[in-house]
Amino acid sequence: MSEIIQDLSLEDVLGDRFGRYSKYIIQERALPDVRDGLKPVQRRILYAMYSSGNTHDKNFRKSAKTVGDVIGQYHPHGDSSVYEAMVRLSQDWKLRHVLIEMHGNNGSIDNDPPAAMRYTEAKLSLLAEELLRDINKETVSFIPNYDDTTLEPMVLPSRFPNLLVNGSTGISAGYATDIPPHNLAEVIQATLKYIDNPDITVNQLMKYIKGPDFPTGGIIQGIDGIKKAYESGKGRIIVRSKVEEETLRNGRKQLIITEIPYEVNKSSLVKRIDELRADKKVDGIVEVRDETDRTGLRIAIELKKDVNSESIKNYLYKNSDLQISYNFNMVAISDGRPKLMGIRQIIDSYLNHQIEVVANRTKFELDNAEKRMHIVEGLIKALSILDKVIELIRSSKNKRDAKENLIEVYEFTEEQAEAIVMLQLYRLTNTDIVALEGEHKELEALIKQLRHILDNHDALLNVIKEELNEIKKKFKSERLSLIEAEIEEIKIDKEVMVPSEEVILSMTRHGYIKRTSIRSFNASGVEDIGLKDGDSLLKHQEVNTQDTVLVFTNKGRYLFIPVHKLADIRWKELGQHVSQIVPIEEDEVVINVFNEKDFNTDAFYVFATQNGMIKKSTVPLFKTTRFNKPLIATKVKENDDLISVMRFEKDQLITVITNKGMSLTYNTSELSDTGLRAAGVKSINLKAEDFVVVTEGVSENDTILMATQRGSLKRISFKILQVAKRAQRGITLLKELKKNPHRIVAAHVVTGEHSQYTLYSKSNEEHGLINDIHKSEQYTNGSFIVDTDDFGEVIDMYIS
């Protein structure tokens, strides 16, 4: 044998071979044929079982025998892949109508593996035989198998639209398919309507075929997605579990799941829900139990008392496979190539296949009827001259001589002569003559009917309709999946996601924030808070994990931080810097922090800047869903800083204190509500080179404590403050000195909650009791507390 050596580039060889491989796996492995809805391995399994007599009316046979037949005759691949395909055809949670009945463990909805093929037994289901019916009547083309030892069908007759009824899923080179299963009665009804009116629209078809009908049931949402898929082959729907509510004896409620989305692994779903419970991602679930038994699927989710079951349901829909999105991608092999097809194209392709199948069957039956008619006519003629025929046969040498004599003497045909010589003597009675004449009449009618079907297209379509109606009547079942027109928007209450727990929120002046358990706080005490050198506590208060923290900075921005997102850190340990939660600028400083339980309130914030601007904005404006970056609270002009943020439930007095000792007190009712991006209005009429040190709310029972740079503290009562109008100069609180005058560096409104003060220089701090500071008159500079020569110039004061 001579060798042919070709000199080819690697790129050409790889491209050519991969092209061949891709074509093979597209056409011969992963995608179904639009006509019978089967992939090649599925078709070969069903045909092997049918041809070996492993039908529904016979006993079950070992699966291993079928797998062996398929591998040996039609599908030269691994036994495991053939067995897996065979098992899938028997799983009633994968197929809307199973094509194989199987005894033994054929897997489960938990994705458990089936028993080995040597243990399970199988046979064709009754419906599967409708796919194969009339296959022996030359209805479809056969091709040689892989080793040319036998023939296999290119496609099955498929007497019902299996592609739509059982759907298909698969991935090949460059193509994937996801066709959902449908209700058999609905699909057949839609096909019948298409036969009556080939111009029927998708909208009209959807009166009969409502949408997918999954074997696992569930609730389908989104008619628009179904319509889009039926029109174009692509679309998206939502499939959610069927969930009911039960009340237990102890008063608790539990959610009972009886149907889950198609192709969702039940055990994985149960595990996921239990993980959400264990990780405290959802609050209100006591226990998750899989109570599935032979009576049906059942998952029980026991809830705590007084929880909102609807919110928990919504959370699970969003965060587990209790609800999934299903994407139609209706790709099938049509005319030898993959095509994305809408429902009209699929039905049209199926109908054309049925026209061909019924026409071929009719031709086959007509041919047989005509052949039998010819024989019957010969037998009737022979019986009419029976004595002569018998005498001729007796005088013949042998069977061959008898046949030749019959043909020559009485002009019988070869086929008629063969039938006559094979005729048994007991058939030569008057009864058989009558029977033959009756058969002749029946054959005449049959041939006329068959010719009418072949000559008349409408008659052929009527045959298809009658046979489809028979299958519909025999195999119809109620719809399992409920269809809802709209996709429901899922709203989740925060209470469901976050366990309710009282904690201590703390913020330091240097911007370190944390939440601490009440237990850790009580075990330590306020003084033992973890701090960096030079840092001090700005604020601490009891909050709930379901609250939201608003952190305000000198740049007029705020950080929106849900309390549950704060790190849970022990009281004695250092907190987390806010910049690690939300990025802020290097020179940005935290000036105050508040918690909000509900933004639906009439409360408001007041913002005051160093250069004397002020603004009021209502609390609801600060609600947001963006946590990842700072947001605008107020517009701060260049060379200005936000220095005070206050929160009030209703209008009240505020006092403004400046560096040069001026004070203006007025009511917040003078401020109009403004948006977050507004800069506000003038708060106080500042002197040259003066600036605001603090703006705080004040009431009649309060006192004002002020610290000067020279180490003096001055405390005054509310009555010294004179209530005036906004934007005035205000009153003087210090005695002006010509040399080294006192300047206020810090001031606070002292309420009944405050008892201590702390003075700060760059390197020192001094603590004392507020009540030790006697109240002063208006025009004094207070009392010296520290010697600045030793302590350093005072730069700040903190009260607690």
UniProtKB/Swiss-Prot annotation:
Active-site residues, as the UniProt record annotates them: 119
Pfam families in UniProt:
DNA_gyraseA_C, DNA_topoisoIV
Keyword GTP-binding set for record: no
Locate the site labelled Interaction with DNA. 39, 75, 77, 88, 94
Residue ranges of every copy of the Topo IIA-type catalytic domain listed in the record: 31-495
Q: What is its main location?
A: membrane
GO annotation (BP), single: chromosome segregation
Localization, UniProt: Cell membrane
Keywords, ordered alphabetically? Cell membrane, DNA-binding, Isomerase, Membrane, Topoisomerase
Query: Which E.C. number(s) belong to this protein?
Result: 5.6.2.2
**Which membrane topology term applies here?**
Peripheral membrane protein
Q: Which InterPro entries match?
A: GyrA/parC_rep (IPR006691), Gyrase/topoIV_suA_C (IPR035516), Topo_IIA-like_dom_sf (IPR013760), Topo_IIA_A/C_ab (IPR013758), Topo_IIA_A_a_sf (IPR013757), Topo_IIA_dom_A (IPR002205), TopoIV_A_Gpos (IPR005741), Type_II_DNA_Topoisomerases (IPR050220)
Does the record carry Lyase as a key word?
no
Q: Site annotated as Transition state stabilizer: where?
A: 118
Assigned GO CC terms: chromosome; cytoplasm; DNA topoisomerase type II (double strand cut, ATP-hydrolyzing) complex; extrinsic component of plasma membrane
One GO molecular function term of this record is:
ATP binding
Give the superkingdom in one word: Bacteria
The protein's annotated catalytic reaction(s) are: ATP-dependent breakage, passage and rejoining of double-stranded DNA
Q: How does it assemble?
A: Heterotetramer composed of ParC and ParE.
Give the protein's function: Topoisomerase IV is essential for chromosome segregation. It relaxes supercoiled DNA. Performs the decatenation events required during the replication of a circular DNA molecule.
Family of the protein in this entry:
Belongs to the type II topoisomerase GyrA/ParC subunit family. ParC type 2 subfamily.
Q: What is this protein called?
A: DNA topoisomerase 4 subunit A
Query: Could you tell me which species this protein originates from?
Result: Staphylococcus aureus (strain MSSA476)
